[in-house]
Amino acid sequence: MAGGSKTRIHASLVSTLLLLLPLASAIHRSDFPASFLFGTATSSYQIEGAYLEGNKSLSNWDVFTHLPGNIKDGSNGDIADDHYHRYEEDVELMNSLGVNAYRFSISWSRILPKGRFGGVNPAGIDFYNKLIDSILLKGIQPFVTLTHYDIPQELEDRYGAWLNAEIQSDFGHFADVCFGAFGDRVKYWTTFNEPNVAVRHGYMLGTYPPSRCSPPFGHCARGGDSHAEPYVAAHNVILSHATAIEIYKRKYQSKQRGMIGMVLYSTWYEPLRDVPEDRLATERALAFETPWFLDPLVYGDYPPEMRQILGGRLPSFSPEDRRKLRYKLDFIGVNHYTTLYARDCMFSDCPQGQETQHALAAVTGESNGLPIGTPTAMPTFYVVPDGIEKMVKYFMRRYNNLPMFITENGYAQGGDSYTDAEDWIDDEDRIEYLEGYLTKLAKVIRDGADVRGYFAWSVVDNFEWLFGYTLRFGLYYIDYRTQERSPKLSALWYKEFLQNLHENQ
């Protein structure tokens, strides 16, 4: 009874909100190429749940979230959105939106519970086969990420995961298994999602697993060296990517005819002050974020901006490493949410905190007490649509207009378990965000950027890492007491946008 009553209430609310949708929009589906991919994105740990079902082993995030104090609301992804059991329902949600692509990640722990030290798990292969076949039946292209933060805890316990070159062989084996099992139907692969975030938070700040850091970045019980370990971990990520991409290009690409890339978190930076020092600081802040990983993959070495500051702290690439790096990625995945200010800490006095120790630049979202854009519920996430245009143009210049996909872009709502469903569902701010960013994206494509797709984060509310369930990015609201899905106003807007229903006649 209660569930049916909620359904009627939500349906009534959505019907009312539908009347509030603007009659005309500044952006239309027809402003993008006909072949353009429009989709939604998720990740395995954030939505699947079923953390011990189907012979899956523990991941690093399974362990991390069960340690008290790590997650804001004390929650975890044990159940999350229960996508493991409800994937068919979620595929129907995507189909109802009218998207032609779905970006998701594979749980390494489901496929290889013990890494290369054990066998392939048939139940894991079966789950992703069913998911891939289900979305293809709806005319939706799978866009698959191999690793989105979560790895088997076995590899951390056995040899220290990303701090050990052994992981390159493990990741290569995992990639090989996935290419062989799913590559006949998957035409878009990415090796990693936001390794720049995972490395920074895991080995510099200590706020993500494996929780390693040192002062002034933090005081981690597990120890660590924030001045060295992030660069070792990043080096092993880069060479793991190179291992996987060599396997794909030598063994699979010619017959499977797919593309492969890497997804990076990409903040745009503006100088805090109109002075040369801050303009240089923005260049350093940019280089220490995304080119940290992309420059080696495109040009074979770390950015000169990093070499100048870090010197010998950056590992070197051996002749064998450079041989593998000759196999180039086919596209860049750009996760863009926000724009921040950067202030010089190389030639100027600067507060000595953790943020100044990496690129000798302090970053902030405010200037003289004024935010750079409209704040959102996610700290440091501001609404600055110009940022996506400038970010794409930066990649155009630096990487000779290598093909790009906007693999994540979305708006954070904040609340808690007492927030009414109606407050989540009425998300006009998200519509304004999507409309603004898509307008700027269409403009930069008209200016010549080779951007081939856009994925809204996310199709459904989900577990938002350190923030648990206190932040929601979904186009669909989830009542976690019942797992009921309800469309937010933004889902209706996105659907109508994809159908060109906003276009003035």
UniProtKB/Swiss-Prot annotation:
Temperature curve summary: Optimum temperature is 55 degrees Celsius with para-nitrophenyl beta-D-glucopyranoside (pNPGlc) as substrate.
Alphabetical GO biological process terms: carbohydrate metabolic process; coniferin metabolic process; glycoside metabolic process
Coiled-coil intervals, chain numbering: none
Cleaved signal peptide residues: 1-26
Assigned keywords, A-Z: Disulfide bond, Glycoprotein, Glycosidase, Hydrolase, Signal
Residues where a beta-D-glucoside binds: 46, 148, 193-194, 337, 408, 457, 464-465, 473
GO MF annotation: an example: beta-glucosidase activity
pH dependence: Optimum pH is 5.0 with para-nitrophenyl beta-D-glucopyranoside (pNPGlc) as substrate.
Family: Belongs to the glycosyl hydrolase 1 family.
Protein name: Beta-glucosidase 18
Organism: Oryza sativa subsp. japonica (Rice)
Gene name as annotated: BGLU18
